[in-house]
């Protein structure tokens, strides 16, 4: 399942944006990923940094489909657009 949301992603001084945040089907061992734990605002906008570049795994609170409660998920951020 992918949610259409805005993600601002900074790596190596470049900023990327993506409209997709894909929830993984299972919980991964978080220590295996060279990432930062990210806490998201209710509108699911996040800022992430990954020194290695490319996609990353971020952990995020988000509101799903208008529900009043948030779910804690591991999410895959897929880069698809570079912005200035």
UniProtKB/Swiss-Prot annotation:
InterPro entries the UniProt entry points to: ORF8_betacoronavirus, SARS_ORF8_IG
Disulfides per UniProt: 22-40
Chief location bin: host cell
PROSITE patterns: SARS_ORF8_IG
GO cellular component: host cell cytoplasm; host cell nucleus
Coiled coil: none
Subcellular location: Host cytoplasm; Host nucleus
Domain SARS ORF8 Ig-like residues, every copy: 1-82
Any Pfam family matching the protein: bCoV_NS8
Keywords: Disulfide bond, Host cytoplasm, Host nucleus
Task of the protein: Non-structural protein which is dispensable for virus replication in cell culture.
Protein name: ORF8b protein
Source organism of this protein record: Severe acute respiratory syndrome coronavirus
């Amino acid at each position: 399942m992918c949610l259409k949301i805005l993600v601002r992603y900074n790596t190596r001084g470049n900023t990327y944006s993506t409209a997709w945040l894909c929830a993984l089907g299972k919980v991964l061992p978080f220590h295996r990923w060279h990432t930062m734990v990210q806490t998201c605002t209710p509108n699911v906008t996040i800022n992430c940094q990954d020194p290695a570049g490319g996609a990353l795994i971020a952990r995020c609170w988000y509101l799903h489909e208008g529900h009043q409660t948030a779910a804690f998920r591991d999410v895959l951020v897929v880069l698809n657009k570079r912005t200035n």
